[in-house]
Every structure is written in C-alpha cells, then in structure tokens.
Amino acid sequence: MHKIVFVTGNKGKFAEVRDILKNFGIEAIQNKDGYPELQEDELEPIAANGAQYVANKLNMPVMVDDSGIFINALNGFPGPYSRFVEDKLGNPKVLKLMEGEKDRSAYFKTVIGYCEPGQEPLVFPGVVEGKIAYEERGTGGFGYDPIFEYNGMTFGELGDEEKNKVSHRRRAVDNFLEWFIGGA
C-alpha cells in the first residue's frame, strides 16, 4: 500500500481525502505541522510550495490542499484568503456582503499539491460551480458549506457522502489519482 502524508489541521479535509484515497489502496497519514504559506492571489503556487517544503522536510511523499471559494459578484473574493475570511468574518458577514447582489454565482476550487522528496511539485486543480445561498442551510460539512449551493442544496445539506462525490476536493483528488495511478 502506498503511503502519502496529507498536511492539514482540518479534520474535515483530512477525512474527505483519506476516504477517497483508501479506495485506491493509498494510505493517507495526517500531518498537522503545517508549512510556511506563500501569500499569493492564486492557489497553485501556494499548494506547490507547501508540498515541496514538507516533502523535503519529512523525506516522504506529501500532498497538501489549498482551497478557496471565489464569489463572482465580489471579484473572486475571498479566493485564496478564504480561511482567513472565514476565521475573521464567518458566513454571516459573507452573506451580508452579498445582500442586494443579483449575481450569486460562485465556485469552490481546490488545488492539490503533490511532491516527492527532492522533486519538483505537481498541482492538480478541481472546481465545482454553484452559487451563494441567501442564508446558511444545513449542518453538515465545514467552512462555507452551509452557504454554497449546488444543484439546489447547500453542501451543508448534502451530507458528507453525497458532497464527497461532487466536491471540488473530490475533483482535485480524482485528477491527482488519474496521474498517480496512470504513472505508478
């Protein structure tokens, strides 16, 4: 069985990725130590840099995830700053920013960064389109899940099993697996 260190302190992210990878004979090992995060306007360099840093530090294959919600009416805000905005403002204030906005379209994007020690990092994006709900709905998931609507239901309403079939993270991990299994 392949082993990959997945660097995140987020229990929800780890559980989602672990459950996907185990179906392909890959054991995800959680590492909560983190890494110096670049301040960039794009997710790809953040994920690539983090994966390379930790792979070289631990001398093991490493996967990191950088994700964001991009709200079109807010010019892509909060984007790569989603975690900071969630911590400082939370969903209620994001909904307040959206008051009166007709364009509620948004997308979640995850970029998986993967690196083996001494190698160049690779990135695997995944995107899911949706819209911002008018209120928080559902108790499932984490982060922006209760305000991100996909096919009429928020990710918070879908439940983990259904969400994990269609999420941005699932799509990014699937892109990684296509490369990893195809090249393994």
UniProtKB/Swiss-Prot annotation:
SUPFAM superfamilies: ITPase-like (SSF52972)
Molecular function (Gene Ontology), one example: dITP diphosphatase activity
CDD domains documented for this protein: HAM1 (cd00515)
Known catalytic reactions: XTP + H2O = XMP + diphosphate + H(+); dITP + H2O = dIMP + diphosphate + H(+); ITP + H2O = IMP + diphosphate + H(+)
Enzyme Commission designation: 3.6.1.66
Source domain of life: Archaea
Keywords, alphabetical: Hydrolase, Magnesium, Metal-binding, Nucleotide metabolism, Nucleotide-binding
CC per GO annotation: cytoplasm
Free-text comment on the cofactor: Binds 1 Mg(2+) ion per subunit.
Entry-linked Pfam families: Ham1p_like
Cited function: Pyrophosphatase that catalyzes the hydrolysis of nucleoside triphosphates to their monophosphate derivatives, with a high preference for the non-canonical purine nucleotides XTP (xanthosine triphosphate), dITP (deoxyinosine triphosphate) and ITP. Seems to function as a house-cleaning enzyme that removes non-canonical purine nucleotides from the nucleotide pool, thus preventing their incorporation into DNA/RNA and avoiding chromosomal lesions.
Family the entry assigns: Belongs to the HAM1 NTPase family.
NCBIfam families documented for this protein: PRK14821.1, RdgB/HAM1 family non-canonical purine NTP pyrophosphatase
Protein known as: dITP/XTP pyrophosphatase
Organism: Methanosarcina mazei (strain ATCC BAA-159 / DSM 3647 / Goe1 / Go1 / JCM 11833 / OCM 88)
